[in-house]
Design a protein with these regions (language model features):
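N-terminal-proximal low-complexity accessory segments that begin disordered
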Residues: 2-76, 81-93
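Catalytic or ion-translocation cores adjacent to nucleophile or general acid/base/metal-coordination motifs
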Residues: 2-9, 362, 382, 389, ...
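Catalytic alpha/beta active-site cores
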Residues: 2-3, 81-84, 88-403, 409-418, ...
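Short acidic (Asp/Glu) and glycine-rich catalytic loops that position anionic groups and cofactors
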Residues: 16-19, 38-45, 62-64, 149-153, ...
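Short, well-ordered alpha-helical packing segments
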Residues: 22, 37, 41-44, 62, ...
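Generic structural "secondary-structure junction" signal
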Residues: 27-28, 340, 397, 453, ...
Length: 471
């Protein structure tokens, strides 16, 4: 079936994408719809030829490298000659002087908190919600449901709750507390009643008092004690009315760990976004995450429920250095969400340029995913610093990093954002980036927030680049 396009500002935009941008993404951003399409088209037509030139240079380099290997097949490999050749064709760049990264307004999840990072397909709303909500997770559930606890001595996983396995979970968890939140004297195994908090001070003596950072009472009962280690938090839940807590001599119902600190919501390798319909599914889910209203109806074991983004977690601050502070301590309830756009190679028929060619998909991704982030700037439920985190994959060398920086600058101009609002995660997964990594970082020094390696892509490019080096 022939797809319907809307003609606007020298672009042919798929109707489903056009409606999404105009009716869903732009309202609430103070951006004028007509101005957006005018400026967007101008940038697309300006940058598309530059994008294409970079891809042609990739091809030229590969042809040159293949030819060099074929021409030198019968000679003993000479490392020095090979390196000089790579420099001559512009593959290896002269390394410049030392410099410092200048990225500003980075969230704590990036700069100060060590922890796991998830990657999920943005086209699957359930996976996206689960990942965003994985900031906090039950240690009891994780232990009970995995082979961390051996299925021996009657501790097998069964269809129904196995008390023997549950005891092993509790034993493991108490050892975890002794290791990570040690008491001054004794063990968490010896605690026989729910602790108390008086004027912000914990009734238990810790080896490191500063580890106790917050608490929560529900009515007159202590519900949570919040501890910190290495900037990660441990929340001990108490509940004498729950099936677990009422059998626990200390009333501990669960131990909640701060877990997935960041999540990459992926528009690239984990999805197949080949047309406007596919892209809009991903864009809509990302917009819902940025607005905070993404939710799905689910059914499990005959029970219907709504899955949505978890709220922030609220505590009362603990006493620190002799000062009592009854103010509120707010912990982020969700993983910091990053967005992986596609690389420079892909094009997509969702938008056609004035010559009928497909739009470079990375340009489209940069504009529309950033546009959706503007909604988060009002609530700051994702980025507290009003930053946009875009992970950019499959860049080949410093010139492509420069192009990414230019693209992000153009997006900021069109969307009227402060300079360097968009931060860049560099995926070091191409050989030309690895050997010129310092210069790639230099060209994104005001935006870079991480370096990451996709080892499968990196291995693949190593093989592809040197394919003709073999016998």
């Amino acid at each position: 079936m022939k797809k319907k396009y809307i003609n606007i500002e020298n672009l042919s935009v798929s109707e489903i994408l056009y409606d999404f941008v105009n009716k869903d993404a732009i309202p609430g951003t103070n951006i004028n719809i007509q101005n957006f399409w005018y400026k967007f088209s101008k940038v697309v037509h300006e940058l598309s030829p530059k994008n294409e030139a970079l891809l042609k240079f990739r091809q030229k380099l590969q042809i040159d490298i293949d030819k060099w290997h074929l021409d030198n097949k019968d000679k003993e490999f000479n490392q020095s000659e090979y390196e000089n050749f790579l420099k001559k064709i512009g593959y290896l760049i002269q390394e410049g002087p030392e410099f410092k990264i200048k990225t500003k307004n980075i969230d704590n999840e990036i700069s100060n908190i060590p922890g796991p990072q998830l990657v999920v397909p943005i086209t699957n709303s359930r996976y996206a919600l689960n990942a965003a909500n994985a900031r906090w997770g039950s240690l009891y559930d994780a232990l009970y449901g995995t082979d961390v606890i051996p299925e021996t001595e009657g501790a097998e996983r069964t269809n129904k709750y196995n008390p023997a396995r549950g005891e092993k979970v509790i034993e493991y968890a108490r050892n975890f507390l002794d290791k990570n939140v040690p008491l001054l004297n004794g063990s968490w195994k010896d605690i026989s009643e729910i602790p108390k908090v008086f004027n912000g001070k914990l009734s238990l003596d810790l080896k490191e008092k500063k580890q106790f950072v917050g608490y929560l009472y529900k009515e007159t009962n202590l519900y949570s004690l919040l501890f910190k280690k290495n900037n990660l938090h441990i929340d001990i839940n108490f509940n004498l009315k729950s099936s677990i807590g009422k059998k626990d001599k200390a009333g501990i119902n669960d131990i909640i760990l701060e877990s997935a600190i960041t999540t990459i919501m992926d528009h690239e390798d984990s999805v197949a976004g080949v047309d406007a319909e596919d892209k809009v599914v991903g864009y809509k889910n990302w917009l819902g995450l940025m607005k905070g209203n993404l939710q799905i109806e689910m059914e499990k074991d005959g029970r219907k429920f709504t899955r949505k983004l978890n709220p922030d977690r609220f505590y009362t601050k603990a006493e620190q250095k002799g000062e009592v502070d009854y103010s509120e301590l707010i912990m982020h309830g969700r993983s910091l969400m990053l967005n992986r756009n596609v690389g420079h190679l892909m094009t997509n028929p969702a938008i056609l340029l004035r010559d009928g060619s497909e739009i470079p998909e990375g340009i489209m991704d940069a504009f529309i995913t950033t546009l959706s982030c503007i909604h988060d700037f009002k609530t700051k439920k994702n980025s507290r610093t009003s930053s946009v985190y875009i992970v950019k994959p499959k860049m080949h060398g410093p010139d492509e990093a420069t192009f990414t920086n230019l693209l992000f600058s153009k997006v900021e101009e069109v969307l009227e954002l402060k300079k360097n609002t968009i931060k860049c995660g560099i995926m070091d997964e191409e050989r030309r980036t690895s050997v010129n990594l310092k210069e790639c970082i230099r060209n994104l020094q005001d935006r870079v927030f991480f370096i990451n390696t996709g080892f499968l892509d990196r291995t693949g490019d190593e093989i592809h680049t040197s394919m003709q080096a073999g016998p």
